[in-house]
Regions:
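Outer-membrane beta-barrel porins/channels
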Residues: 4-251
Length: 251
């Protein structure tokens, strides 16, 4: 959209033009899916175990107290309190859904993966709005200014599930993650064209584009559901179904 206003033929300022433009500068829409058998017992639960192992090393938990630390996190009213634990949330969720344990050597252990499935959906984009004003001085000096405003919206949801086993024990778990980025941005573009010689078509110009300054906020949360059965040597078994939600994180 352009609106042109003629000021006069004999005035220094001949024209003032106003413009507006909109376009979607970035499209985030995407779908992804995968799945299959897991070779070599590969499982995300071992990633959870490694995360918590690194955390315990950093905070100085003695190896002999690994089991006690797991019990404390498992029974905590708020294990996501960064002032108390500051532990990786995926590892905490693994503890509280019976996906992590401790072996006879006080080492954190996970499960052996049998098969998995993963789906991801991304939506959103960056919407750009340009507001323009341009001046024509004596048909020889042209000045333009554009203010760019950006609206950012990005959403991603993912689902991951694994069938797992460890010795005679077996089960599965499902992990849902939600992530959102919202915000806005702004930039400026300034340009000029000069015709230095009145009787010549020769022109020279230059332009300045500022970086785009963004103010963004991230929101993320997760949900982990597990259904595992422990088969004991005396012939009895115990089925545990657990669901764990994280609080909404804002950054």
């Amino acid at each position: 959209f352009v609106y042109s206003t003629k000021i006069g033929n004999n005035t220094s300022l001949r024209f003032v033009n106003f413009g507006f433009n909109y376009h979607k500068s970035k499209n985030f829409n995407r779908l992804f899916a995968s799945g299959g058998n897991l070779t070599g017992g590969l499982s995300q639960t071992w990633q959870m175990a490694n995360m918590m192992g690194v955390y315990m090393d950093e905070v100085g938990v003695p190896e002999a107290d690994t089991g006690n630390e797991l019990d404390e996190i498992y029974n905590s009213n708020n294990p996501y309190d960064v002032n108390r634990y500051d532990a990786p949330y995926l590892g905490v969720m693994g503890i509280r859904t019976n996906l992590l344990g401790v072996n006879s050597e006080n080492k954190l252990i996970g499960w052996d993966g049998l098969g998995n499935k993963y789906t991801s959906r991304e939506e959103g984009g960056i919407h750009q709005y340009d507001f323009n004003v341009a001046f024509n001085f004596q048909d020889r000096f042209y000045l333009g200014l554009t203010l760019g405003a950006y609206d950012v919206n990005y959403n991603r949801s993912s689902y991951y599930t694994e069938d797992v086993a460890y010795g005679a024990d077996e089960g599965f778990y499902e992990l849902n993650n939600w992530f959102e980025t919202r915000g806005s941005g702004i930039d400026l573009k300034l340009g000029t064209v000069v015709r230095p010689f009145e009787d010549s078509p020769f022109r020279i110009g230059f332009a300045i584009h500022t970086p785009t300054w963004y103010n963004l906020s991230d929101y993320h949360s997760a949900d982990l559901y597990s259904d595992v059965t422990f088969n004991y040597q005396d012939g009895t078994s115990e089925q545990l179904k657990t669901e764990e939600f994280t609080p909404d994180y804002v950054k």
